[in-house]
Regions:
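N-terminal Lys/Arg-rich, disordered targeting/topogenic segments
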Residues: 1-18
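Terminal, regulation- and interaction-focused segments at domain boundaries
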Residues: 27, 31, 35-73, 78-86, ...
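Ser/Thr-rich, low-complexity intrinsically disordered terminal regions
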Residues: 47, 63-126, 151, 159-163
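Generic structural motif
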Residues: 56, 101-103, 130, 142
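N-terminal signal-anchor/signal peptide hydrophobic helix marking the start
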Residues: 21-26
């Protein structure tokens, strides 16, 4: 039997500063890329909000925007001339401007973004029919835009415009439903 000899442990060579710096930079780049992709996907799916109203049609909403906007709300509606082509399947597409001068003034008076926010005054509401025939109302997600811009724009967009536009759209839908129910009752 051979005597046991003592073996020297393998020498561990410390890595140089270049390896640590390269790993750090790679981590920063990978993190930034992941953050950018996540932000892009989040905005893509959340920048437009849509409400579907089964039993109601886009044409009924079009009439409601034209005839039933409550004057005391401070909101004005006007049909938006749009050069967009109709959907290829022939569905109706209506575009409306739904604006409130008080909120528009609040955006224009923003000390940080007042010169550019008037271009973004989020007024356009689009109405079309889903494949099943129900009305789909879409608009910019003003709450999200408020978070992105911050400051006075956040207050105006998130706390003012967003909840009031949602309430007005729901009010129009309720009015259409009531009108349809009354017509049905009056039919012989």
């Amino acid at each position: 039997m051979e005597p046991l000899t003592e073996q020297k442990p393998a020498q561990i060579r410390p890595r140089g500063k270049n390896h640590v710096l390269a790993a750090f930079l790679l981590g920063v780049i990978a993190g930034a890329a992941a953050m950018f992709c996540t932000g892009f996907l989040y905005l893509r799916h959340n920048l437009i909000v849509s409400y579907e109203f089964p039993g109601l049609t886009a044409a009924e909403f079009d009439d409601a925007f034209e005839n039933a906007m409550p004057a005391e709300s401070g909101w004005k509606s006007s049909r938006e001339a749009c050069s967009l082509p109709l959907p290829s399947d022939g569905r109706a597409l209506y575009n409306w401007k739904l604006c409130n001068r008080t909120y528009a003034r609040g955006l224009m008076d923003d000390p940080d973004h007042g010169l550019v926010l008037p271009a973004l005054v989020p007024c356009t509401v689009s109405v079309t029919n889903a494949p099943d025939g129900s009305a789909v109302v879409s608009r910019l997600n003003t709450s999200l835009l408020g978070v992105i811009y911050g400051g006075n724009a956040r207050r105006v967009l998130r706390s003012g415009i967003a909840p009031e536009q949602e309430a007005l759209i729901s009010l129009l839908a309720d009015g259409i439903r009531k009108e349809k129910a009354q017509r049905k009752e009056n039919e012989p």
